[in-house]
Curated annotation (Swiss-Prot):
It holds the Pfam family tRNA_SAD. Its EC number is 6.1.1.7. CDD domains: AlaRS_core. InterPro entries: aa-tRNA-synth_II/BPL/LPL (IPR045864), Ala-tRNA-lgiase_IIc (IPR002318), Ala-tRNA-ligase_IIc_anticod-bd (IPR018162), Ala-tRNA-synth_IIc_core (IPR018165), Ala-tRNA-synth_IIc_N (IPR018164), Ala-tRNA_ligase (IPR050058), Ala_tRNA_ligase_euk/bac (IPR023033), Thr/Ala-tRNA-synth_IIc_edit (IPR018163). Keywords: Aminoacyl-tRNA synthetase, ATP-binding, Cytoplasm, Ligase, Metal-binding, Nucleotide-binding, Protein biosynthesis, RNA-binding, tRNA-binding, Zinc. GO terms for biological process: alanyl-tRNA aminoacylation. This is Alanine--tRNA ligase. Binds 1 zinc ion per subunit. Catalyzes the attachment of alanine to tRNA(Ala) in a two-step reaction: alanine is first activated by ATP to form Ala-AMP and then transferred to the acceptor end of tRNA(Ala). Also edits incorrectly charged Ser-tRNA(Ala) and Gly-tRNA(Ala) via its editing domain. Consists of three domains; the N-terminal catalytic domain, the editing domain and the C-terminal C-Ala domain. The editing domain removes incorrectly charged amino acids, while the C-Ala domain, along with tRNA(Ala), serves as a bridge to cooperatively bring together the editing and aminoacylation centers thus stimulating deacylation of misacylated tRNAs. Its cofactor is Zn(2+).
Length: 873
């Protein structure tokens, strides 16, 4: 049986043998494409090649592109093939081969490479596209296996842009998956028998956005083959979740709960097990999305794509609760196995930390929610749906947990009413955001040429005329509130070429309004976002924030110097895959087989600083793109998108670097002042991201903060050692006054101290306890020993030793940290689990164990008096 990794490689190898250039999977986070929240298909990263905006590196391309779609999240785990994260296998022709070759390639791959049975293959085609039908017949396929589709099913059209008919390849898995036959395909009925494995789109026409179609001069092939579906067929798995892409993750989840995932239940369809299987699938699917998205640079917040990640983590977390998982944080433990099951590289420690932090935050949310609901349940036996929705919307408390808690308390809630509140909220949200932005984009589409001039290279202040003033509803004469404008000339740089937009303000009638954002439309006009009161008939005074611009220039110029040094230090193969320059820091993405060593990073940093100290003047010039190449200017595809090829702008730091660039730059390298690399992240297969800062002030502050953190880390280890060995002493004896050199010295001492701590722990495996000085309490039926100052590193061992020493003793130990307390309960005579549950009446505890020893966690403050009160009943 072929593994998923082997299947993916067979796809790439096959099309490489057909002269296709392999492109690595791009980041899930789109670059310079505001229309997408995520990369959601194989062709999404190639759109500019198909539109002619950019020249493709080859007319034939093959890839396996990781993608995310979250528009139908409720179906995940319920259907056999629905995922939020998936891979799309693609082969593309940009003005090269067309239908005949594309279908011949498809036949050869499915029959000769995948070895699928010819008689089990079915094909759909657009009913007017008889050419495609004839090609399938000429390739030797059964006419009864060719099914004519409608415009709805077999014509790819997404509004403005290239479109055309498509043909789909289906694989028949047999009647055990559905006794109904080919009518399932003919009537387009959702089923698990006929699995679509390949969709081939023939980009033949251009839609002008008003459903007027003209034939394209260059016809293209855009295909997408479902990787997970192909793997499930070749591994004879009932669903995609029963393949080696998901099962290792599911088996890892099983270790966190006493529930089991049963593959065979697909056919047995036992209701309780079906629900359990669904829970496993949801967690596995969502965490694949989360791990890979965070690995590509996504975060967790309440805004944009980061909110999607928060939603997926929280949905997976509450699903884990439904599986009976009691750990305060558990999802982060899946990160290594997720990485192993795929081919995408990232920093697992960073990804796991982001997930764990969100889990702990959500755990507190759940605890707070419980307390609020407890009060509501005490008031009434029926809870208003508005309260349920408020818990969900304001506090992020899952409605499923509210429902379970209500059931336990015998309280009624109306889920139908809750659903009404939720739908009303979604409609309001969509009308405010989605529809509004769509209208803005549609308005900009009506501006069919460049009408403005950017003068920000030469001046930071202008008096400008308003050419267009509008908001999310319509064109305006007067703006009151948030809206957009385009000027005849502007000093504000728009976000492009990796550089963030300028900050500043516009002034009219003595009133100043802050510039919130500046971006470019399709004709490179500068669109300004502002909130205020503006009259389109009056001129605007425009003022760029000079300090902010200077910081942007520092970081952008430092990016160019970094690029030069990377080529010198790592190799001429280094190219710029992406950059982001804002007023606070810069990032630079580049390919490399291995992560640069610490020593190499130090050398890169050193060489950039040397160039800064040379005090080299910046020079601008304008040339044709061909002349720029002759001059040896570095040209990135990212920059050519924003420039006229007959008049490109070149930024030069003499004898160091010449780059084609439309951004703004510092007049002399000495104004950058300093340069510090603050992190190097692995962003995917062979792609690394350097983050750096500039200026003496920021570098000094970073170094001081980093040094202070290292000292704190060092002192914490020393304290741990001293708890075990009170006579241990350590004092820093620095050899240098330089803060960065001192950091190195502290880092080296931390490594040595960690080894010392391991030795100390080993010598204390049998914890020494002075049994003679212990003080016991007799309360109710318990003889109890309580110690709320136990060492967290030995607390479990202490509990076990005391239990073995005293047969009739109840031992309660706690180790109090800043934000949480570790609790250990041990006893031979008393049931530790029962005591743990008693304490839950006073404390929000998580954890578990057995009758003789339980360990748990709480964020509540634990006191001896309260423990005794609980034991006394």
């Amino acid at each position: 049986m072929l593994s998923s990794k082997e299947i993916r490689q067979k796809w790439i190898t096959f099309f490489e043998s057909k002269n296709h250039l392999k492109l690595e999977s791009k980041s899930l986070i789109p670059v310079d494409d505001p229309s997408l929240l995520w990369i959601n298909s194989g062709v999404a990263t190639l759109k500019d090649y198909f539109s002619g905006k950019k020249t493709p590196p080859s007319p034939r391309i093959v890839n396996s592109q990781k993608s995310i779609r979250t528009n139908d999240i409720e179906n995940v785990g319920i259907t056999a093939r629905h995922h939020t994260f998936f891979e799309m296998l693609g082969n593309f022709s940009i003005g090269d081969y067309f239908k005949k070759e594309a279908l011949a390639f498809a036949k050869e791959f499915v029959l000769d490479v995948l070895k699928l049975e010819k008689e089990k293959l079915y094909f759909t085609y657009y009913h007017e596209d008889l050419e495609t039908k004839q090609i399938w017949l000429d390739l030797g396929f059964d006419p009864s296996h060719l099914i004519a589709g409608s415009r709805k099913t077999n014509f790819w059209d997404v509004g403005m842009g290239p479109c055309g008919p498509n043909t789909e390849i289906f694989y028949d898995r047999g009647p055990k998956y559905d006794p109904r036959g080919v009518e399932l395909l003919k009537e387009d009925i959702e089923n698990d028998r006929y699995i679509e494995i390949w969709n081939i789109v023939f980009s033949t026409f251009n839609n002008d956005g008003k459903n007027n179609y003209s034939e394209l001069k260059l016809k293209n092939i855009d295909t997408g083959a479902g990787f997970e579906r192909i793997v499930s067929i070749l591994q004879n798995a009932p669903t995609n979740y029963d393949t080696d892409l998901f099962l290792p993750i599911i088996r890892a989840i099983e270790k966190l709960t006493n529930k089991k995932y049963v593959v065979e239940n697909y056919f047995q369809n036992e209701p309780v097990q079906r629900e359990i299987n669904t829970y496993f699938k949801i967690i596995a699917d969502h965490m694949r999305s989360v791990a890979n998205a965070i690995g590509d640079g996504a975060g967790v917040s309440n805004v944009g794509r980061d909110y999607i990640i928060r939603r997926l983590i929280r949905r997976a977390y509450r699903t884990g609760i439904q599986l009976g998982i009691k750990d305060e944080a558990f999802l982060y433990k899946l990160v290594p196995v997720i990485k192993d099951s795929l081919i995408f590289d990232y920093d697992t420690k960073h990804v796991a930390k982001v997930i764990k932090d969100e889990e702990l935050l959500f755990s507190k949310t759940i605890d707070q929610g419980k307390k609020i609901l407890e009060k509501e349940f005490e008031k009434s036996k029926k809870i208003d749906a508005s309260i349920v929705f408020k818990m969900f919307d304001t506090y992020g408390y899952p409605v499923e947990l509210t429902k379970e808690m209500a059931k336990e308390k015998g309280v009624e809630i109306s889920l139908e009413e809750f659903e009404k509140y939720r739908q009303e909220h979604e409609l309001k949200s969509k009308s405010k955001k989605g529809d509004g932005m769509k209208k803005v984009i549609n308005f900009l589409a009506n501006i069919d040429k460049k009408v403005d001039e950017f003068v920000g290279y030469d001046t930071l202040e202008t008096t400008s005329k308003i050419l267009y003033l509008f908001n999310s509803e319509s064109k305006l004469n007067k703006l009151e509130g948030q809206g957009y404008f385009i000027l005849d000339k502007t000093p504000f740089y728009a976000t492009s070429g990796g550089q963030k937009h300028d900050q500043g303000y516009v002034e009219q009638d003595g009133k100043k309004f802050k510039i919130l954002e500046v971006f470019k439309d399709k004709n490179w006009n500068h669109v300004h976002l502002v909130k205020g009161e503006i009259d389109s008939s009056k001129e605007l005074k425009c003022v760029v924030d000079a300090k902010n611009r200077k910081n942007l220039e520092r970081n952008h110029s430092a990016t160019h110097l970094l690029f030069k040094v990377l080529r010198d230090q790592i190799g001429p193969f280094v190219v710029q895959l992406g950059s982001n320059n804002n007023e606070k820091r810069l990032t630079f993405d580049f390919p490399s087989q291995n992560k640069p060593s610490k020593e190499k990073i130090k050398e890169i940093e050193k060489q950039v600083r040397k160039i800064i100290e040379l005090s080299i003047d910046r020079q601008y010039s304008n040339e044709t793109i061909d002349k720029a190449k002759e001059m040896g200017a570095i040209i990135t595809i990212e920059e050519t998108e924003y420039m006229d090829p007959t008049n490109v702008r070149i930024v030069t730091f003499k004898n160091i670097t010449s780059d084609l660039c439309g951004g703004t730059h510092i007049p002399n390298t000495k104004l950058i002042e300093n340069f510090k690399i603050i992190s190097v992240e692995n962003k995917g297969t062979g792609i690394f991201r350097i983050s750096a800062i500039t200026t003496e002030k920021l570098v000094r502050a970073f170094n001081q903060e980093h040094f202070d953190n290292l000292i704190e880390q060092q002192q914490n280890i020393i304290k741990k050692i001293q708890k075990i060995n009170p006579s241990f002493k350590y004092k820093n004896q620095f050899k240098s006054d330089d803060l960065e050199q001192r950091q190195v010295e502290v880092e080296e001492s931390i490594l040595a101290l960690q080894q010392e701590f391991k030795k100390a722990l080993k010598s204390q495996e049998n914890v020494e306890i002075n049994f003679e000085n212990l003080e016991f309490e007799n309360i109710a039926n318990y003889k109890v020993y309580i110690n709320l100052e136990a060492d967290k590193n030995t607390i479990k061992a202490q509990g076990a030793q005391l239990r073995e020493k005293f047969d009739d003793l109840l031992i309660i130990l706690a180790s109090v940290e800043k934000n949480s307390t570790i609790l250990t309960i041990a006893s031979k005579k008393y049931d530790s689990n029962k005591i743990f549950n008693l304490l839950k009446s006073e404390y929000s505890l998580k954890g578990g164990g057995n009758a003789i020893l339980v360990q748990g966690f709480t964020s509540d403050k634990i006191t001896k008096d309260k423990i005794l009160k609980v034991l006394n009943g």
